[in-house]
Design a protein with these regions (language model features):
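Peripheral, non-AAA+ core regions of ATP-driven protein-machinery
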Residues: 1-202
Length: 202
């Protein structure tokens, strides 16, 4: 099964859109990562594998091909951990495909499934807003800077398990998950006072 998740790669001061594609196919278990990934991204195979297992999800027992498109764009950094993990969950049937529609995300994963901050979030948020993303998912430490981009819904959670559980139960606000809408006219004052709007994950 093929699944996709949207993210971006920082190129200087600008973020370039990247489609993370994950395909599961019959064959000897293994993970092949293509699309000009740097060393940090190549190592994401082990981080994601451990994060999935320690978060209570099934790891793939088939051949996995992960493609970062476009193939001619050099990608750097561990921020692709989260989109790879989410696409893997969809491809393996552990997360519904509609949960990723219109969603952009970035973040490093700890081996325990925790979401860790990444670089270039403001540029990524600006690009996501430009492409009319439904929402951007980032680690908690990046949520404040991402919210500087107006007109974009920002979602965050402490760990992968919380994020997925919230996605599967959109009518409830999972403990430890926070969702805020970027500043809009009339909201700037409440934002500066620390106010945030809780939103369900669609």
């Amino acid at each position: 099964m093929l699944a996709r998740c949207l993210s971006a790669s920082l190129q200087g001061l600008e973020a370039r859109p990247v489609v993370v594609e994950v395909d599961l196919a019959p064959g000897l278990p293994g993970v092949q990562l293509v699309g000009l990934p740097d060393k940090a991204i190549q190592e994401s195979r082990e981080r994601v594998r451990s994060a999935l297992r320690n978060s209570g999800f099934r790891g793939p027992l088939v051949r996995v091909v992960i493609n970062l498109a476009p193939a001619d764009l050099r990608k750097e950094g561990p921020s692709f951990d989260l989109p790879i993990a989410l696409a893997l969950l969809v491809a393996s049937g552990q997360l519904a495909r509609p949960q990723l529609e219109g969603l952009w995300c970035a973040g490093e994963l700890g081996l325990d499934g925790s979401l860790r901050p990444c670089r270039g979030v403001i540029a990524l948020a600006a690009k996501a807003q430009q492409h009319k993303a439904q929402a951007l998912v980032v680690p908690p430490e990046n949520a404040q800077e991402a919210s500087l981009i107006e007109g974009l819904t920002i979602r965050t959670a402490a760990n992968l398990r919380t994020l997925v559980e919230h996605a599967q139960r959109p009518s409830t606000v999972a403990r430890g998950a926070h969702h805020c809408r970027s500043q809009r006219p009339g909201q700037r004052r409440s934002k500066r006072r620390g106010g945030s709007e809780l939103l369900p994950l669609h």
